[in-house]
Amino acid sequence: MNSEKQKQLISYIAPSAPATRRPATGNEAFLRPEIGFTPKWYHDALGIDFGEQWHTDVVYRRKSLISMGQELMRRFGNRNIRWIQHPDEPPDLLTGTFGACTIAAIYGLPLIYAADNWPNCEHQYLQSEQIDRLTPLDLDINPFFCKFMDEVEWISHQNGRIEGYINWQGVLNNAYRLRGEELFIDMTLEPNRARHLFECVTMTMIEATERLYECQRQTEVHIQHSTVSNCLVNMVSPDQYQDLLLPFDQRIASTAGLIGIHNCAWNASAYIQHYATLPSVGYIDMGIESNLVNAKESFPDARRAIMYPPVELANKPLSEIRRDLELITHDYAPCDMVFADIESGTPDDRVIEVIELCEEMSEAL
């Protein structure tokens, strides 16, 4: 196994979960597809209710995961979808829990559950005075976190191993959920207020992650990476990112053996030079409009990935998707092709076609 590849992360999408990252094996294909479907896709196919019970009742969640795995097998056979490929591994009962709202919920924002979607949080934004008085939370007495850790303990006792990941999001994403659009005004007019909020959020993210990882280590699951979701980074200038946010991403990176950076399908070109200063980047993703050549040069040892928009997957002619993949193969690969958030109505044949395109291009190289 290539030792450098052991220092990489790859995209990972558990059934119905938002995309996250996991350690690479070192045997990844040159152009590796990662396929993921939304809760609505599974709700429409199987009638699974992804409301509050799915996120708080592990028994219910486990039963639904079995059904989802069976549906994937029925529709896609032995295609390159990881949940199909490894049915005998201890089940991952953690990934997808509370969607992308765990940190917001820890800070007291009520969650809004839906039968066919990930949770959202109510827009009960903190006011300026509340931000100024904010302190890092005491997780020992935090009601939401304590209840979540009860789930983790149940998984440990019943499953033996606590497999999976919580999507802790990123500093900017979490701060936006707490502050709303006023955050961007703070970053311009009251940068110290923004820094204070980022500080509190970062400390909570790190402490919550470390507590979960310690529980997982006790079940022989050793996770040594962190991942940050910078879905809103295009809302701030590169200079603002460098000044106000990069120090916190650096702190998160310094606590982990590897860090993964998620940018959604946006153009990440303007931020690449700053991301390149982070230590031990094991994964970075971006949209196809990014400067892929520069990204490859800037992150030669990381596993790179392209987030391919689900609307384009569903609607683009296959010939155009092929051209996109050829460009990516030439300028950016080896990399993951992340086909996430696939919705109901996307033909199964289209999913199979893009998997086969990735396999064809990998085999050619």
Give residue ranges: language-model regions.
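A gly/proline- and charged-residue-enriched helix-loop-helix capping module
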Residues: 116-150
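Active-site loop segments of alpha/beta catalytic cores
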Residues: 1-58, 137-365
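Membrane helical hairpin/interfacial module
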Residues: 56-110
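Conserved donor-binding loop and adjoining core beta-sheet/short helix segment
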Residues: 109-117
